């Protein structure tokens, strides 16, 4: 399975996402998982990225992918929209937005351990 992290650098307070990127890379390498990190450029980019790269000729065509929305509610919405059109796609969330309303309502677990989700 390919683990695709879609990070929105504008999410939250616009803090530097380099530490998160480095942590994701470090954990994926340590666990030996196949991963890809993508930084969104503009609104709607996450949906377009997923659709483009999962289509024939795209880098993920024919692969089973888990897409991680790393951002706020808007990023989650875009990733869900893109992944809903990809057969067999899975979605995970790493909330780094300001409100994170989706996670407050939909996620009951307070402790999220990324490494347990990467296996």
Residue ranges and their predicted role:
Residues 4, 30, 65, 84-119:
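Catalytic core of DAGKc-family lipid kinases
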Residues 14, 73-76, 97-101:
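Gly/Ser/Thr-rich beta-alpha loop segments that engage phosphate groups in nucleotides
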Residues 1-67, 117:
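ATP/NTP phosphate-donor binding region
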Residues 75-87:
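Short Gly/Thr/Asp-enriched flexible loops that form oxyanion-binding sites at enzyme active sites
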Residues 45-48, 78-79, 101-102:
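Phosphate- and divalent-cation-binding pockets in alpha/beta enzyme and binding domains
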Residues 64-70, 74-78:
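A glycine-rich beta-strand to alpha-helix segment
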